Amino acid sequence: MKIVLDTNVLVMALRSRRGASFRVLSELPTNDFQIVLTIPLYTEYQDVLSRSEVLELGYTQNDIKELTRYLASISHKQEIYYLWRPWLKDPKDDMVLEAAFASQSKYIVTYNSKDFVGKGIEESFGIKPLNAKDFLIEIGKLN
């Protein structure tokens, strides 16, 4: 099963090793799900995770580079041939949706689910937006 991780899930995983986001990353690699990456999404991961507010958590640029390279090494690389813009308010969210649609992902794991829910994504594309905790519950990894 393929999933797309919104960048905010990675930020939350770096902020706390006790939260559901860190648990999702800790499951990797797994036979239960595979993360999907596109070039724009990978670039956003690098950009956001390299910002001062993330680095101030005690990470170095090298740590971020290692994390993003690791994610790329275990991910399903997806090319985007058709842009669904504008479908959502935020073009960055459209980028996540495009990755999920093109890869036929079942889930978008995000903390901005309000930006995805009620927009016809689940009904039109069969893609369910969930936060990290609800995703882990959904796949039976958390009670």
What function would you assign to each model-found segment?
Residues 14-15, 49, 120, 140:
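Short, flexible helix/strand-to-coil boundary loops that buttress conserved ligand/catalytic motifs
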Residues 27-83:
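PIN-domain endoribonuclease scaffold, especially VapC-family toxins
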Residues 1-37:
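Short, well-structured N-terminal submotif of metal-dependent ribonuclease cores
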Residues 17-25, 50-51, 122-125:
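Short, glycine/charged-enriched secondary-structure capping and boundary segments
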Residues 101-107, 113-143:
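Acidic, PIN/NYN-like endoribonuclease modules and their adjacent C-terminal/linker elements
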Residues 73-109:
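Active-site neighborhoods of divalent-metal-dependent phosphate/nucleic-acid chemistry enzymes
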Residues 6-7, 37-38, 112, 131-132:
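A secondary-structure boundary/capping signal
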